[in-house]
Amino acid sequence: GHVWMISPFKTYSCDTYKIDENGNAYPENFDSEVIEDYYLKEKFRTMASGITFGEIERDGHTYAYIYYGGFERDWTEDDYKYIDPVVERAEGLIFDIRNNPGGSGETGLTLSGNFFSEKTIIGYHAIKTGKGHNDFSELQALYSRPSKDHNWSDKKTMLLTNRDVYSTANLFTCALKQAKNVTQVGGISGGGGAMPMTHYLPNGWLVVFPGNVLFDTNKQHIENGIEPDIEVTSTDADFEAGRDAIIEAALVELMK
């Protein structure tokens, strides 16, 4: 991931992560209008930061729902002022990051701390140290540190993913796989997550490439994506019927 070339007339990139090993496109697995119209209905709010949150009611149970579409900046106390009470009174949490292309790695690791009660190794990375193909440093641990003020580590949580969960969102997924209260539901994530580096060629074109490589706690690289604990596909027919199969699976799991 994070490999592209930028010229004055075109940007070149590799988007093969959207195609599976059989040459088929991964399903979209996301429709925000279906979520707002059929699940949240009028019980949701979108913050200026772009965070959408609300409540989903099912069979007498109430679950908090949060959609986060990008890790461009840290959550503010104003965000938490409205979101924390919704999470606290809910019986469980659906944290949806489908179609999240990433953003700040620091923001991702900070937010992951909401789901841990103690400092936890969530993966490893190795830094590129030379020109050779295998010139990398020794593996260095990556940690998630628990949030003191906003901790949801005791809240049963479903993390929703699809193939368009990329970069920092992929790293966030890797982190939450280590949280005891979190289950990943949906499709395999899109991969990526390494720190992009830049270099200008003599002709002025810009090349972007990863400066490190990321691994999970089993020391398996995550550049090709992270498999969900519960794999679910939402079809076009599902969405046309006002149904999100991934949310439905998450609700079933929350009610167990």
What are these language model-derived features?
Residues 67-71, 96-100, 125-128, 160-164, ...:
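Active-site-proximal beta-strand/loop segments in catalytic clefts of secreted hydrolases
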Residues 1-123, 156, 200:
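Flexible, low-complexity junctional segments that flank or bridge functional domains
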Residues 228-256:
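Low-complexity, Gly/Ser/Thr/Pro-rich intrinsically disordered linker/tail segments
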Residues 78, 82, 106-110, 167, ...:
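Extracytoplasmic/secreted proteins, especially bacterial periplasmic and envelope-associated proteins
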